[in-house]
């Protein structure tokens, strides 16, 4: 293991923490750790020189990203170049990533346009991949998230090199310039559309997810099951499915008695082509380049270990785009791969037998990675430790060969073969999906940790760094793995503990939501105002976004999986349906509801203790006092609420 690689990586991680940390005390601590690590590990002047050059280069790249020359303000005229595979159509709106060509500069932007006719919709849905438009529009910043648990669009788009949104007001189609890349992209899109047009099945969903890295046309329910159980994190997001694909291809080529050198060349060519198929997404690029670098090291005797290859790619990624370190897929892919290297090394040197090694790797990897995964996905199901190992075995032996054969059969129109694969694999995957859906119901098996503080970040990454040092010195023994697993769990447990009381106001559209978190572990009270129903010009009811979807992530991000009380004010029957969805995601002690005076329908049964509040005062199980104030005689029959939380009074006015 090349020490300078991983010390440089650690220095960059510390530098990013210093940049984003608001506390001067913590900034000072990180600076001292960085200086101490630097002095301790580097004795050679030549090493010091090159590491200084790397750090200076990364610093300059960071300055270019965070102090950029952005798209000019105001109304602009230019040329937009789009790839239809990057577009997403939601109702009348189409959004996607595009290249904006102005008179004096080019920019990557977030394209947005509201379609006005079916002809325009058909234009964006054509089979040809590339689309060139002469446009007039306005540049504006990407919308900031309203709540901590909302999707952080500015951070995500900055991490992939996009700093502005371009809202198109009008356009005119231009002729595309022919090129070999556009020909390849057109073939890719035809391939993609052929699979996407097949009847809905689990095999089709897996083909879209793994072969193309696309989730927009996949079954949302299936994806949600996998997210909650951790299957998607370990496979698609980390890029480990590509590693499984490489292992399978190696076995096939060796069985055909093809030499190792020829096999490597064939695999590298195939991986480069596949890289263009997935548009060189972050996790796929990491998996492909790690294989290429590892094989190059063997060929040219560079003596690079797998962990060295991972560190070099980390540094090269920062040279390419420094802001990539903000990307969730980047952090998960590199973090999970580093942890997988540690657990694989432990299994290889301390265990005998393939099955025993597989079980231990499947068990240790998610435990050590628990804080990392929960930081981004908020929850982790205990059964996923076993399910992840099962899915990996199934992917390597059955699913990946089956999915590849299915895709080939669809393209060359072998209908009977594709139907046969769908019949057999769908039976298997349908059974797995029922198991996953059944496992989701057990809330006591679900871990919820929320997002961590900067201190938890630094402790976790130092722990990983120490583990890598142990890897280098060959002292990664069974006791070490136990220590790292316990340390990882302790860091995870420290994340959701609240040292102080908090009252958090959540912005959920037209609704008012208040989350009260007392001092301690996993306790909270949620106050939600019911949605007011509106009618359109024809008298049809209009419902806005479900509050359960808007609120759930904002509770999970705080590390809360148990609610002492849920208060729903001014509720209608539609709100009770949202309430039932919310209760499925949390362990709830009590629900107290005040119905809208105009609501005469029955709410039905809920799975928890439910009480209905009339005019007057009530004390909840959490100690919060709630007073329902009579309607003030206005045209709308609504009732305002007064909440008293630890001496603070909050008035929610129903206007």
Q: What is each PLM-predicted segment?
A:
Residues 1-5, 177-186, 205-217, 276-283, ...:
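Hydrophobic alpha-helical transmembrane segments
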Residues 341-448:
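Alpha-helical transmembrane segments of multi-pass integral membrane proteins
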